[in-house]
């Protein structure tokens, strides 16, 4: 901003500030710059004008130019040299200008005005730039030492705020410059800068009293300290603030030769990188290098300095509570790069710690076994599965199963292999296999079904199975083998479980099988016949006792996984109803010889069911016999399918072609006459009745018309007559006046 000041020898006066783009005339009378009591001053003595040589205000090196043009009689002198009349010359700061030949001496000075704005919207910046342009100042995008003011609506801890406080520059509202412009235009005193301090809007500061005026203590706040930056982006952002405060900013590159004593030296502050910040791009090697430096600091009892503490140390003018590696971190300080650290987000064994009790993310190992092997092995790559709505028992079970090591996996595989030999030698009645619902697989995605199957297969009691092998291997042999069949085989063998489900209320044998099937369905397993033993169609007493013991063992798993598979129960119920209807229809079509065969089969091998049938009613007996016969028939069919399961193809993909264009077939109702074919497509119209359509139109006339009788206005007629007389009299007078100036008024016509 250019100012015209009176010289020291001249009479003291107020400085005259010159706005950009305005011409100031220096003269003796009716001028912007008025000089009185000097007879050598002309009325239009000289002209002063401030112009910008460039259109961009962000170029801080280019200041506006001040030019002067002499139009006087006695001349204008610049540094005691007379100017040529009618020519312009450029003035520099400090030049002495003399108007006339007497004591009208002045001095021109340029007062720097470089404004940097922070946290302003687009409209606020536009208004600010216009005011600065008229004042002859400049604007800067980033803070430099040449900046004189910082414009903010509210004080927040930013890099520009820190630099402005360190440099001792005032922080003002944008309205200050608008009021300053009005004061210059009206030639009044400029506003007080203290009344335009913005309010503090920073949660880290709170309600604490802070002095934001220029303090000398801030200029040497970081004297004797060395701030070590491990990232180039942080060094570029915060390095200038450290240097302004008298400190040293040093960028540490990866693979440097600095010793460990350098980081633990007094006055050395290692700035925290903030690995969890998504804006920073950190490679794996840099991450390891940063962790190594953090371990060095931890061994020496030091801590890294967050970015926010640099600003708080400048605001509160202390380095004891802030930017002190040996001190405790402040609880109210929030780093500039928020987010959990790596140690908080990921544990050592690789599992994810849940952030909320009802939204839990864990790594569940993929337990899909190979087709030819009955042993269950854990995959090396865990599969992430999200489980919602688990109770405390299931969470404990998840945490316990997620920490299985590879050694225990190998031992479990060996135990499973040993138990598999027992299964093949003794050939028990039923085996346990992973259960897959074909109805659910058609309606759900493959990914969700695979995650659900992995959860079911994984949470089977492996530890209990090894303990029971040592006590009684014969009883636990059914639990130790788990074979995963193809989808086609499971769809054919699955109705054996639900068919036994229906007869739970009538006979003891079906009730026992119902418990086993429910336990297996809740635990994610399905009961299917083995078919290799000769007595696979009968149920022995020892097997029933063993299954009762298994029910006690599986009770805990039922409670844990009841919430997981609650959605599958409606689907199983629907499937059981459909299969029951199909069985009833097939039974009605069977001949009487099949019914006799059914009674013969039910009479021999199951004595317990016969005793239960004798106690029930006659109608219930027939229903149970039909149900048991259908169950055994399905068991026999399943045996044949299991024998030929090795020849069946596995892992097939069902493809179905669908048309991508969906259109509705517009059906036309064609009316056909007798012998005339199709009728023509024509439309029927009907006149809509409007009000008054059936009446004659109402014609205005006759009595509807009223005669208009004009009244005579006597006053108006008298006024018109008077005006006519006045005009006639005026015409006569005009004609008489014209006759007086005629040379020959009476011209005789020949």
Curated annotation (Swiss-Prot):
Gene3D superfamilies given in the database record: 2.60.200.20, BRCT domain, Nibrin, BRCT2 domain
Basic and acidic residues biased stretches: 502-514, 540-550, 581-599
Gene: Nbn
Biological processes annotated in GO: blastocyst growth; DNA damage checkpoint signaling; DNA double-strand break processing; DNA strand resection involved in replication fork processing; double-strand break repair; double-strand break repair via alternative nonhomologous end joining; double-strand break repair via homologous recombination; host-mediated suppression of symbiont invasion
Top-rank taxon, per record: Eukaryota
PANTHER family cross-referenced by the UniProt entry: NIBRIN, NIBRIN-RELATED
Region (Mediates interaction with SP100): 111-328
Chain ranges of the BRCT domain: 105-181, 224-315
Cross-link (Glycyl lysine isopeptide (Lys-Gly) (interchain with G-Cter in ubiquitin)): 436, 683, 687, 732
Pfam (any one): NIBRIN_BRCT_II
Region: Interaction with MTOR, MAPKAP1 and RICTOR, residue numbers: 221-403
Modifications after synthesis and translation: Phosphorylated by ATM in response of ionizing radiation, and such phosphorylation is responsible intra-S phase checkpoint control and telomere maintenance. Phosphorylated at Ser-433 by CDK2 in S/G2 phases abolishes interaction with TERF2, enabling DCLRE1B/Apollo recruitment to telomeres. Phosphorylation at Ser-433 in response to dysfunctional telomeres promotes non-homologous end joining repair at telomeres, while dephosphorylation by PPP1CA promotes microhomology-mediated end-joining (MMEJ) repair. Ubiquitinated at Lys-436 via 'Lys-6'-linked ubiquitin chains by RNF8, promoting NBN recruitment to DNA double-strand breaks (DSBs). Ubiquitinated at Lys-687 via 'Lys-63'-linked ubiquitin chains by PELI1: ubiquitination takes place following PELI1 phosphorylation and promotes ATM activation and DNA repair. Ubiquitinated at Lys-732 via 'Lys-63'-linked ubiquitin chains by the SCF(SKP2) complex: ubiquitination takes place following SKP2 phosphorylation and promotes ATM activation and DNA repair.
In-chain residues carrying the UniProt-annotated modification Phosphothreonine: 337
Crosslink feature (Glycyl lysine isopeptide (Lys-Gly) (interchain with G-Cter in SUMO2)) location: 528, 569, 580
Alphabetical list of CDD domains matching this protein: BRCT_nibrin (cd17741), FHA_NBN (cd22667)
Protein name: Nibrin
Family: Belongs to the Nibrin family.
Role, per record: Component of the MRN complex, which plays a central role in double-strand break (DSB) repair, DNA recombination, maintenance of telomere integrity and meiosis. The MRN complex is involved in the repair of DNA double-strand breaks (DSBs) via homologous recombination (HR), an error-free mechanism which primarily occurs during S and G2 phases. The complex (1) mediates the end resection of damaged DNA, which generates proper single-stranded DNA, a key initial steps in HR, and is (2) required for the recruitment of other repair factors and efficient activation of ATM and ATR upon DNA damage.
Subcellular location: Nucleus; Chromosome; Nucleus, PML body; Chromosome, Telomere
InterPro entries assigned to the protein according to its UniProt record, in alphabetical order: BRCT_dom, BRCT_dom_sf, FHA_dom, Nibrin-rel, Nibrin_BRCT2, Nibrin_BRCT2_sf, Nibrin_C, Nibrin_met
Phosphoserine PTM sites in chain numbering: 343, 347, 433, 508, 517
Domain comment as written in the entry: The FHA and BRCT domains specifically recognize and bind phosphorylated proteins.
Subunit structure: Component of the MRN complex composed of two heterodimers RAD50 and MRE11 associated with a single NBN. The MRN complexes dimerize on DNA to form joined MRN-MRN oligomers required for DNA double-strand break repair. The MRN complexes dimerize on DNA to form joined MRN-MRN oligomers required for DNA double-strand break repair. As part of the MRN complex, interacts with MCM9; the interaction recruits the complex to DNA repair sites. Component of the BASC complex, at least composed of BRCA1, MSH2, MSH6, MLH1, ATM, BLM, RAD50, MRE11 and NBN.
High-level lineage: Eukaryota, Metazoa, Chordata, Craniata, Vertebrata
């Amino acid at each position: 901003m250019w100012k015209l000041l009176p010289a020291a020898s001249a009479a003291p006066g107020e400085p005259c500030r010159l706005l950009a783009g305005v011409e100031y005339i220096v003269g003796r009378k009716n001028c912007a710059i008025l000089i009185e009591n000097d007879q050598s001053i002309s009325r239009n003595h000289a002209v002063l004008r401030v112009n910008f040589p460039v259109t961009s205000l962000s170029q801080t090196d280019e200041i506006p130019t001040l030019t002067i043009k002499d139009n006087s009689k006695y001349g204008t002198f610049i540094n005691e040299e007379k100017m040529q009349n009618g020519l312009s010359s450029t003035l520099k700061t400090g030049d002495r200008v003399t108007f006339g030949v007497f004591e009208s001496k002045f001095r021109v000075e340029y007062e720097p005005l470089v404004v940097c704005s922070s946290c302003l919207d687009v409209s606020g910046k536009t208004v600010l730039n216009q005011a600065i342009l008229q004042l002859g100042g400049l604007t800067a995008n980033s803070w430099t030492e040449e900046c004189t003011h910082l414009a903010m609506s509210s004080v927040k801890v930013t890099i520009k705020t820190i630099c402005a406080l360190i440099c001792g520059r005032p922080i003002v509202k944008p309205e200050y410059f608008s009021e300053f412009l009005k004061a210059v235009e009206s030639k009044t005193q400029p506003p007080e800068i203290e009344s335009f301090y913005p309010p503090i809007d920073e949660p880290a500061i709170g309600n604490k009293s802070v002095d934001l005026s220029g303090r000398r203590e801030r200029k040497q706040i970081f004297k004797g300290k060395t701030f070590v930056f491990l990232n180039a982006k942080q060094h570029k952002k915060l390095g200038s603030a450290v240097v302004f405060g008298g400190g040293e900013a040093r960028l540490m590159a990866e693979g440097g030769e600095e010793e460990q004593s350098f980081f633990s030296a007094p006055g050395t502050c290692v700035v925290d990188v903030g690995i969890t910040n998504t804006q920073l791009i950190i490679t794996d090697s840099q991450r390891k290098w940063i962790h190594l430096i953090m371990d060095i600091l931890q061994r020496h009892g030091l801590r890294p300095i967050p970015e926010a503490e640099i600003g708080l140390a400048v605001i509160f003018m202390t380095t004891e509570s802030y930017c002190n590696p040996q001190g405790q971190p402040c609880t109210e300080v929030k780093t500039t790069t928020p987010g959990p650290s790596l140690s908080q987000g990921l544990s050592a064994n690789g599992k994810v710690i849940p952030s909320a009790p009802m939204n839990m993310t864990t790594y569940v190992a993929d337990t899909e076994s190979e087709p030819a092997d009955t042993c269950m092995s854990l995959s090396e790559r865990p599969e992430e599965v999200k489980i919602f709505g688990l109770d405390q028992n299931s969470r404990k079970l998840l945490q316990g199963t997620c920490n299985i090591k590879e050694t225990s996996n190998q031992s479990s595989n060996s135990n499973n292999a040993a138990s598999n030999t027992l299964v093949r030698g003794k050939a028990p009645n039923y085996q346990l296999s992973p259960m897959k619902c074909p109805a659910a697989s058609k309606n759900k995605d493959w990914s969700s079904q695979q995650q659900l199957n992995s959860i079911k297969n994984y949470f089977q009691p492996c530890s209990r199975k090894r303990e029971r092998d040592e006590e009684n291997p014969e009883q636990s042999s059914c639990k130790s083998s788990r074979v995963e069949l193809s989808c086609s085989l499971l769809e054919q063998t699955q109705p054996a479980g639900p068919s036994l489900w229906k007869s739970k209320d009538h006979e003891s044998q079906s009730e026992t099988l119902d418990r086993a099937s429910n336990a297996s369905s809740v635990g994610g397993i399905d009961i299917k016949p083995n078919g290799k033993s000769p007595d696979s169609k009968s149920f022995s007493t020892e097997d029933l006792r063993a299954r009762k013991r298994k029910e006690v063992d599986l009770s805990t798993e039922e409670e844990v996984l009841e919430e997981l598979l609650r959605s599958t129960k409606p689907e199983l119920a629907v499937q059981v109803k459909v299969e029951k209807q199909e069985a009833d229809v097939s039974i009605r079509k069977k001949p009487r010889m099949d019914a006799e065969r059914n009674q013969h089969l039910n009479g021999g091998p199951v004595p317990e069911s016969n005793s239960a049938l004798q106690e029930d009613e006659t109608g219930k007996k027939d229903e149970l016999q039909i149900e048991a016969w259908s169950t055994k028939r399905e068991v026999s069919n399943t045996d044949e399918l299991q024998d030929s399961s090795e020849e069946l193809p596995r892992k097939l993909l069902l493809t179905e072609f669908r048309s991508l264009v969906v259109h509705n077939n517009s059906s036309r109702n064609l009316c056909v006459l007798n012998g005339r074919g199709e009728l023509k497509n024509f439309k029927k119209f009907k006149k809509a009745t409007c009000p008054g359509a059936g009446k004659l139109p109402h014609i205005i006339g006759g009595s509807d018309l009223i005669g208009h009788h004009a009244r005579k206005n006597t006053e108006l007629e008298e006024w018109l007559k008077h005006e006519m007389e006045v005009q006639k009299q005026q015409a006569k007078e005009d004609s008489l006046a014209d006759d007086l100036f005629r040379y020959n008024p009476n011209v005789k016509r020949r």
